[in-house]
Amino acid sequence: MLDGMLIALARMEPEERLEQVARFVPRMDNWAVCDTFCTSLKFCKKHPALVWEFIQPYLTSARVYDVRFAVVMMLAHFITEDYVEQVLALLDGVRHEDYYVGMAVAWAVSVCYVKFPALTLEYLRNSSLSDFTYNRALQKIIESLRVSREDKSLMRSMKRR
């Protein structure tokens, strides 16, 4: 965890930071380190195209925390008007069956819904998410304090049985 914080906070060029990130990601072995690391990488805001390109290969890795890293990076830095459609398309393509990957995808979908409800609702109606991930995403939306009572009722009606 300390190594991750140093990578996030030390002064360095973005390319050097991404080299350090690439060395650190394989050492992640739990969701807390992964999520804290991803959310602490504030340089992403200044270099979105570079970071976006960097995280793409991690989405198809066989390693749990490689995939979670990419998903949490998208959720922390790319649920924006410029990237949300691409984020949803990529989330729909995540096929790793691990619990921690599914939960990260569900979390990301719920944040998409909070920020872009109409777009995410359309996505949910047509997504190919696993039943587990889809229902977890709905549950996270229902639990959100930033979603209306009416939208929560709609989410309850959309659950897959």
Task: Tell me what each language-model feature is.
Residues 1-161:
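Alpha-helical scaffold domains
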